[in-house]
Amino acid sequence: MQYCIISESLKLAGHSKGNHGYGGIWGGRNATYHHNLIAHHDSRNPRFDHSYVGHGWRGPIDFVNNVIYDWGSNSTYGGETDSESNVFHVNMMGNYYKAGPSTKSNVRNRMMELTSYCTNCISTGFAATGKFYLKDNLINGNTADWGKVDSEHSSKETRDKASLKEGAKLAERWTTGLTELKTIESAQNAYNNVLTYAGASLVRDAVDKRIVQEVKDGTGGLIDKVSDNMEKYFPTLAPGTPITDTDKDGMDDNWERKEIAKLGASVGIEELKPLSYNISNRYTNLEIYMNELVVNTFPDAANANSTR
């Protein structure tokens, strides 16, 4: 998961549990989360999943070169473990944490809160923190090492917190050979690149532009309901110019004619179907078309950071 903007979850919007402005629960096996912008969430910035949810999905996770801004009551936490053979492993490298107007004073310098206690873990007779490798993270412009990690998330945990923290440390990056990025930027460079390129759009809309500017300016905050300010949180977007798509296959006629010319007379427009492999043996025609739409969106340096 890369270059996404995850922003402004709704804090008081009628959830049965009350306050629920949360960023997300991130987990998986051999999963990489890099160059994402997480902004304006009360908690779960993100929350790493618990290993008891699925023993086959306990990591490792690379959490690399992300930007986390304006957490409210908590920043990153989670990754609790329910057995010695089911340990959750997370590599946190080159991430940039920046407190905002909503960040409570007691957590302004908290990069992460360790989590060991959970009801499901206790029921198995074993509960421990995950294992974390920390390197080159920043929080509010300062080095974010283990001194910026608190323990424990649950008030029900009665074990020695210093021992829990010591047991959570990994001396080296946990690897399986499957998830590593070839290039890991400094946290400062990642901050600049995320604010420049993040967002699932060729053109940023008013909301994405506002979120990025708020990160730069140190402004904005948590919201309760979109209806509190529809113009700001859910603006009407002006329609763009649609493509000409005579055969209604999702691909621009001009692009199809260009590709047919390259292929020669052996392929007609009716044969250049979205799910066919006329242009490549590896990618469908539609995949190639969609890739060409965004091929110039990122500079080569940013593309290199996305390559495994």
Please give the residue ranges for each predicted region.
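Non-transmembrane alpha-helical segments in soluble domains
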Residues: 3, 34-35, 212, 252, ...
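Long, ordered, amphipathic alpha-helical scaffolds
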Residues: 97, 101, 106-240
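Extracellular calcium-associated, cysteine-rich motifs in secreted modular proteins
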Residues: 228-308
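Active-site proximal loops enriched in glycine and acidic residues that flank catalytic Cys/His/Asp
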Residues: 50, 78-80, 94, 99, ...
